[in-house]
Amino acid sequence: MANAKETTFYITISVVAFVIGKIVIALLFYKRWKRKHTIHENGFPVKGGGKMVMFRSQLLNSVSSDMFMKKTHKLSNKDILGSGGFGTVYRLVIDDSTTFAVKRLNRGTSERDRGFHRELEAMADIKHRNIVTLHGYFTSPHYNLLIYELMPNGSLDSFLHGRKALDWASRYRIAVGAARGISYLHHDCIPHIIHRDIKSSNILLDHNMEARVSDFGLATLMEPDKTHVSTFVAGTFGYLAPEYFDTGKATMKGDVYSFGVVLLELLTGRKPTDDEFFEEGTKLVTWVKGVVRDQREEVVIDNRLRGSSVQENEEMNDVFGIAMMCLEPEPAIRPAMTEVVKLLEYIKLSTRSSF
C-alpha cells in the first residue's frame, strides 16, 4: 500500500515537473520572439489611421513618416516601375540621395491580407546580397505599402529584351547571382520559402549589374518537413512547371523549372512567350527541346552573342546543359537549387583551368 502511494506521488511529481518545464520553454520562446521583433521593427501610427513599420534601415530611419506619406500621396502613373503579383510598384523619390521602390497592395479580402502578412513574416529577416531588401511597410484600412530598396538598372527582362546588348559575362554573372538568391530562399531561410513566380522580370539588377531576386507577393512559406503547399494557383505562363497544371501545388522543384526557363532566356535572348512562339502555338521550352531533338543546338544561342570567345562558347554550352537539367519533365530528376549553384560556379573554374 505504501509502495503504491509512493509510486503515485512520484508519477504526480514527474507530470507536474514536465508541465512546468513545457511552460518555461514556451515562455522563453515567446520572450525571444518578442525581443527579436522589438529590435527589428519600429511601428508608429500615421495620420489617416495607418501604421508604418520600419525594419533596421538607416536609410528609412532618416525619413519622417509625414514626409514619406506626403511623397507617397503624390505618386502618379509616371512613377510606375511595373505591375505584377499583388500590386503596382512605384519609384518614390524623397530627395536627391534617397529613393525607394514602393509596392502598393490594394486591400479588399481577408485572403489578400493573409498573403500580405505572410509575405512580411518571410521577408522581415532576409538579408542576402542576391535578394532585394525590404526596408519597411505601411498598412492602412484601404491599402498596404511595401518599401524596398530601389534597383537602378531595373529588371533582367527589360534589360535583356531592350535595345542595349547584354554580353555573356554579364549574363553568366546574373545567372549565378539569381541562383544563389533562390537557393538561399529554398534552403537557408527558416521556414523555407517557395517563390512561386521566378521569371526575368522578378530578377532585378543593382548598380553593379548583380542579380537580386524580388517580388515575394506570391511567395509561400513552407515548414521544413513539408514537401509542397497547396494554396491559390500563381505564376506566369511560359515559366510554370508542367506538373503545376495538374496538381496546383507549388514546390521547390517548380521554382527550379522556372529558373531553367530563365537560363534559356539568357542564352537565347528570347521571351518564353515570344510572338513567334505564340503564332506557332508553342513556347520557348518546347521550341528549344525540338531544336535539341533535331540536333540543331547552334541556333539556340542569341545572335548578339555571336563572335564570343572559345571559352565563352564553352560556358554557354555548359549553362545550356544545366538549363536542360532544370527543365526535366519529372520533378524528382531536377537538381536542387544548391546543386544548380555549384554547377554554375564550377563552369568558371573548369573553363579557366582549360585555357
Swiss-Prot record:
Annotated ranges, domain Protein kinase: 75-347
Q: Name the top EC class.
A: transferase
Binding, ATP = 81-89, 103
Residue positions where Phosphoserine is found in the record: 201, 230
Compartment(s) where it occurs, according to its Swiss-Prot or TrEMBL record: Cell membrane
Cytoplasmic side residue ranges read: 30-355
Say yes or no: keyword Transmembrane helix present.
Answer: yes
Catalysed reaction equations from the record: L-seryl-[protein] + ATP = O-phospho-L-seryl-[protein] + ADP + H(+); L-threonyl-[protein] + ATP = O-phospho-L-threonyl-[protein] + ADP + H(+)
**Extent of the signal sequence:** none
The cross-references to InterPro entries, in alphabetical order and at most eight, read: Kinase-like_dom_sf, Prot_kinase_dom, Protein_kinase_ATP_BS, Ser/Thr_kinase_AS
Q: Known Pfam families for this protein?
A: Pkinase (PF00069)
| Superkingdom of origin organism | Eukaryota
Stretches assigned to the Extracellular side: 1-8
Q: Where are the Phosphotyrosine residues found in this chain?
A: 148, 244
Q: Which residues carry this modification: Phosphothreonine?
A: 231, 236
Question: Per its record, what are the GO molecular function terms?
Answer: ATP binding; protein serine kinase activity; protein serine/threonine kinase activity
> Does the record carry Cell membrane as a key word?
yes
Q: Which GO terms describe its cellular component?
A: plasma membrane
Q: What UniProt keywords apply to this chain's record, in alphabetical order?
A: ATP-binding, Cell membrane, Kinase, Membrane, Nucleotide-binding, Phosphoprotein, Receptor, Serine/threonine-protein kinase, Transferase, Transmembrane, Transmembrane helix
Mind telling me which residue stretches traverse the membrane in this protein?
9-29
Q: Please give the family membership noted in the entry.
A: Belongs to the protein kinase superfamily. Ser/Thr protein kinase family.
* This protein's name: Receptor-like serine/threonine-protein kinase At1g78530
